[in-house]
Amino acid sequence: MAKAVTSSKGAEKSEKKKPAARSGVKKDASKSKDASKSQVNVKISSAPARSAAKDTPVKKEERAKGTVGEIKQVIGAVVDVQFEGALPNILNALETENLGNRLVLEVAQHLGENTVRTIAMDTTDGLMRGQKVVDTGAQISVPVGEATLGRIMNVIGEPVDNVGPIASTKTRSIHQEAPEYVEQSTVSEILVTGIKVVDLLAPYSKGGKIGLFGGAGVGKTVLIMELINNIAKAHGGYSVFAGVGERTREGNDLYYEMIESGVNVNPKENNGSTEGSKCALVYGQMNEPPGARARVALSGLTIAESFRDEGQDVLFFVDNIFRFTQAGAEVSALLGRIPSAVGYQPTLATDMGALQERITSTKIGSITSVQAIYVPADDLTDPAPATSFAHLDATTVLSRSIAEKGIYPAVDPLDSFSRMLDPLIVGEEHYTVACQVQTILQRYRALQDIIAILGMDELSEDDKLLVGRARKIERFLSQPFHVAEAFTGSPGKLVSLEDTIKGFKGLCAGDYDDLPEAAFYMVGSIDEALEKGKRLMAEAS
C-alpha cells in the first residue's frame, strides 16, 4: 500500500513538471507558486480519505471472501489456483463445480505470483485449466449438534446416507485450537464403562486416549458398539465414529449393526427422523483422495468437541489412526515436502499432536478417544505407531487366543494396561485386587506348558488351587453384551465398578472355590454367578 502511494506522488510530481517543459511559455512566478500551493492543498486534503479507507477494519475471514480465481494446474489431488486480487488465507475452503458436484479445495500453500496450492477433498477427475474457483472466506465447516446423531456424513459435512439434508442450524470449523490450560480439567477420573475386564485391569480416563489393538474377527466392532451403548446408558453421553481410510463395506456393516443393536435409530423406519440415536458417523473411505482421509478425523473431532462444550462426556472413535498418518504422508509428498524417516511427512509429530491435544477434558465436559491402531509389519518402532503411543493413556489389546476359548470380550488382561491403575487414583482396594488378578493369571500362563505336557496331576496342591481360581477368573472376565443379545440370546449386563471389585476380590480370596467354573461364564455381577452356580449344582445332583 505504501508503494502505491509513493508511486502516485511521483506521478503527480512528473505531471507538474511536464506541462512547463512542453509549453515552453514562461509563467508568472507568483501564479506558478499559487498553483503549486493549490496542488499541495489538494493532495493534503485527499490524503485523509485514502488513509481512512486503509484503516477501515476488515475481518480477516472476509478479506478475500467471494474472490474468484482460476485453475492453473491439476496434479492428482493437488490443484493450483491463481487469483487476481487478494489471496485466500491458508486453510481457507475454495469451491468449484466438478461434474455437477460441489468440490471443496483447502488452501495449503502460497506459491507466489498470486497462486495458491490446494488439496482437493474429492476426486479431481473432470477439472480443467481455466475453470473458475470461488474463495468462501472461511475454513471447512461441518454441522454439529444432536441433528448429526444417527447420520453419516463425509469430510465436508455432507450427508451420504440418502436420508436428506442434516437439519442442523449450527456449523463449526474443523480447525480448532486445543483448550487453554485454564480451561482443562486436572482431575484424574475414571470413565466407568460397565465392562468388567476394562474397568478392573485397564480403566479408561475421562478425556484420555485409548489404543485399541485387534485383528479381524476378535470382536473389535462389538466392543466399540458396547462402549457406545454403555456410555449412553450410564452417562447419557453421545459418541462420534470417524472412519479414517475405512473399507466401505466395514463402514456399511457398522452402520446397520448399530441400527440392529439399538445404538442408532433407522430413519427410514422412523419417518426420516434419527431421534433417539446415540452416535454420529463421519466417513472418509479408503478409495477417497488423501485430502479427505487426512481431514475426516478433524471433522469427527469437531462434532465431538461441540458435544463436550455442551457438558457431555463424549466417546470419540477413530478407525484407523494409522491411516490418518498415511494420508498425511501422501498429502505431504504431493505438496513437494522432503520426506523424513521411512517416507513419512516431516510434520508427523506436529500433525498428530494437533489432533491428539484437542482430545481432552475441560471443566465442562470430556472427550474420551478410542483409537484403533495398525502396526505396520508388527514393528512398534515404526514412526507412525510410535508417534501415536506417546499420546496414549491406556491400551486395550484383543487376543485371538482368548477369543478361541469363547471368552468375550476377548481382552487380554496381561497385555492391556492403563496409567489410571494407580492406588492414588483408583484407590488401594481396586489396585490390590487388580494386581492379585494379574498375578494369578500370570502364574497360570506360566504353568500351562507343564499342564499341556504332564497334566494337572503333576502340579502341587497350591498350584492346582491357583489354576482352578485362574480359570474361574478367566471366565468371570467374560460378559454378555447388550449389542450382542440378538446373537447370544442372553440379556446384556452393565456391571458397576463396586460389583466388579467385590466379585474378583472374592475369587482371589477363594470364597467361591466350591462353585463350578461354568457358573462364572457369561454373567454380570458375582451375585448372578452365585445363583447360576447353585442352579448348576442342583441340576447336577
From Swiss-Prot:
Pfam families for this protein: ATP-synt_ab (PF00006), ATP-synt_ab_N (PF02874), ATP-synt_VA_C (PF22919)
Catalytic activity, as annotated: ATP + H2O + 4 H(+)(in) = ADP + phosphate + 5 H(+)(out)
Compositional bias per record (Basic and acidic residues), positions renumbered to this chain: 25-36, 52-65
SUPFAM superfamilies in UniProt: C-terminal domain of alpha and beta subunits of F1 ATP synthase, N-terminal domain of alpha and beta subunits of F1 ATP synthase, P-loop containing nucleoside triphosphate hydrolases
KW Translocase (keyword) present: yes
One term under GO cellular component: proton-transporting ATP synthase complex
Intracellular or extracellular location(s): Cell inner membrane
GO molecular function: ATP binding; ATP hydrolysis activity; proton-transporting ATP synthase activity, rotational mechanism
Keyword line: ATP synthesis, ATP-binding, Cell inner membrane, Cell membrane, CF(1), Hydrogen ion transport, Ion transport, Membrane, Nucleotide-binding, Translocase, Transport
Listed PANTHER family: ATP SYNTHASE (PTHR15184), ATP SYNTHASE SUBUNIT BETA, MITOCHONDRIAL (PTHR15184:SF71)
Summary of subunit composition and partner proteins: F-type ATPases have 2 components, CF(1) - the catalytic core - and CF(0) - the membrane proton channel. CF(1) has five subunits: alpha(3), beta(3), gamma(1), delta(1), epsilon(1). CF(0) has three main subunits: a(1), b(2) and c(9-12). The alpha and beta chains form an alternating ring which encloses part of the gamma chain. CF(1) is attached to CF(0) by a central stalk formed by the gamma and epsilon chains, while a peripheral stalk is formed by the delta and b chains.
Purpose of the protein: Produces ATP from ADP in the presence of a proton gradient across the membrane. The catalytic sites are hosted primarily by the beta subunits.
The protein's name in its UniProt record: ATP synthase subunit beta
Species, as recorded: Bartonella tribocorum (strain CIP 105476 / IBS 506)
